[in-house]
Amino acid sequence: MKKGLTLQFASDKLPAHTEIIPVKMRTKTLILTAFVGALGIAGASAQVYSVNAVGYVNKSLPKGFSIVSNPLNSGGNKVSEVFGANPGALTIYQFGDAGFSVNSFDTDFEEWDNGDAVVAPGEGFFVNNAGDAAATVTFVGEVPQGDLSNALPKGFSIRSSQVPQEGKLDSDLGFPTDEAVTVYQYGANGYTISSYDADFEEWDTDDAAGPVVGVAEGFWVLRESATNWTRSFSTSE
């Protein structure tokens, strides 16, 4: 870490790593320029100009299906704002109490079925890239800060970290392990399933420390009861 730039989760410094997705932070008045590859925020170079961290995240969407999330607050977090102009042949599937809602971008008319649909940080959703190759989406907005809360209902939901940070789900990202919980991560080879044993207080991953979640990655959560995924986060501490 250079030039004194640190981020904190509660009273602890964020763990160093990841070089998956570049993130840059900008605001209005120049204070410092720093390299933040050690911040855990996706191995990034950053220019920080004030306490409000505004920046971008580049996310690659493979051909076909993936589960992603919006890692930054962008206005009202409307699909039309988050994905920008002409994002390509994309269809978004958002999961809720009534099942999936489907929202497609029409490349001929250059508009979404519902451009006002909201995809806020903390919500995961499927994206189907119907193009011939992987596409890159650039998310632009503010890093969520303060006392953050993400509702985890009983049963299945699709969620993500509200902070654009890669790390172990519970130890780094503050995911609650108050009961037995199962996490399903979707990739090129299908699902990777990680379960937490509340009696033995460990995950069934090889290191027993739980799954690693990437920046702008969404995943399924299965819980026996509802709770909130809470975290205090600030870029200025």
Model feature map: region roles:
Residues 4-7, 43:
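Extracellular/surface-exposed low-complexity segments
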Residues 33-40:
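Bacterial N-terminal signal peptides
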